[in-house]
Amino acid sequence: MQAYFDQLDRVRYEGPQSTNPLAFRHYNPDELVLGKRMEDHLRFAACYWHTFCWNGADMFGVGAFNRPWQQPGEALELAKRKADVAFEFFHKLNVPFYCFHDVDVSPEGASLKEYKNNFAQMVDVLAAKQEQSGVKLLWGTANCFTNPRYGAGAATNPDPEVFSWAATQVVTAMNATHKLGGENYVLWGGREGYETLLNTDLRQEREQIGRFMQMVVEHKHKMGFQGTLLIEPKPQEPTKHQYDYDVATVYGFLKQFGLEKEIKVNIEANHATLAGHSFHHEIATAIALGIFGSVDANRGDAQLGWDTDQFPISVEENALVMYEILKAGGFTTGGLNFDAKVRRQSTDKYDLFYGHIGAMDTMALSLKIAARMVEDGELDKRVAKRYAGWNSELGQQILKGQLSLGELAQYAEQHNLAPVHQSGHQELLENLVNRYLFDK
């Protein structure tokens, strides 16, 4: 079959001095960083939906891209053509993983029977493509938010029949992910929220989605899936308020339904922005709570209040993110999926490569800077010094529950405690980070 990206053989590493826009300047898959291959640290994935499904339409304009597989025709044949181009792209970009929603790769059809039959055929196609290319599935998921039936949510829908349809999609997508060797399964609550409290029963909807997630966990164990289940937090859009608002909110939900040992989080940078947090904050919070799983690497626009899904280009932001991930031991089943899309005006098909190449170089350079921060250890030393008092006898007695509140008050009075504030040295630490970022 004629190659779609026929002017490119493969994107290769050419080094920082290269001016070739179709080459990596910082991402060298085999380069060792802290004794581990860069490819194994970063575990890059390209997403199916923004890259091959979005046609360039927005709220104010029709599709602008005119991709061959987005033209009128027989749905399954177009899906197979899309798979041909997708795996050509994955191979030429040199990414080890990809991610998909069920209806990204397969026509939804007019009934559950058609949906399942179409998906089964496309899973066989994807399995063959994976075998031929060596590209693996980082995670799969089900799109339970686009179809009008999900206008009021899927698991939180007031109609149990919609809940049941969503369950069918999730079971089918989980089975497909398992068959394709996927390392994770993601649950994003696209419309699991509300537009107005005037017609919403919060307790009822919370019970529904809690039971849905328990059923997902039960099915995971029943089918023998060894991968990780991931919830992707997002505060709003498309609904006014979503129940998986941010990492801390998701953790509270998991604790309520006894799922904190079963489900982790897939953190998207742009969703952190929408929640009023930094990407760094959400990563660090997930690690502190023991639920860090995977990352959707992108960026938002601080001037815009919606999910712009741009490619990550800030080394300053992502070096701190990679620093937290390295300190936590790195990814296990997760990775860096580029949940990002070219701009509507970027109509050249090679713009898809430019966006991903820049993002991969950004994350590779961020990794190398983060590794220097880890090796130097200065930030860790200063944090340890700041909290050193908690290693004292008093600090340990407090943490181990050996002193009551009253006993602690008595201790303070008996020892005439008069603590003096110690500087947090924020400016010094910010300057230190700049040295890692900008000094050769």
Curated annotation (Swiss-Prot):
Subcellular location: Cytoplasm
PROSITE patterns xrefs: XYLOSE_ISOMERASE
Keyword tags: Carbohydrate metabolism, Cytoplasm, Isomerase, Magnesium, Metal-binding, Xylose metabolism
SUPFAM superfamilies: Xylose isomerase-like
Protein name, per record: Xylose isomerase
Cofactor comment: Binds 2 magnesium ions per subunit.
Positions annotated to bind Mg(2+) 2: E268, H271, D307, D309
Self-association and partners: Homotetramer.
Enzyme Commission designation: 5.3.1.5
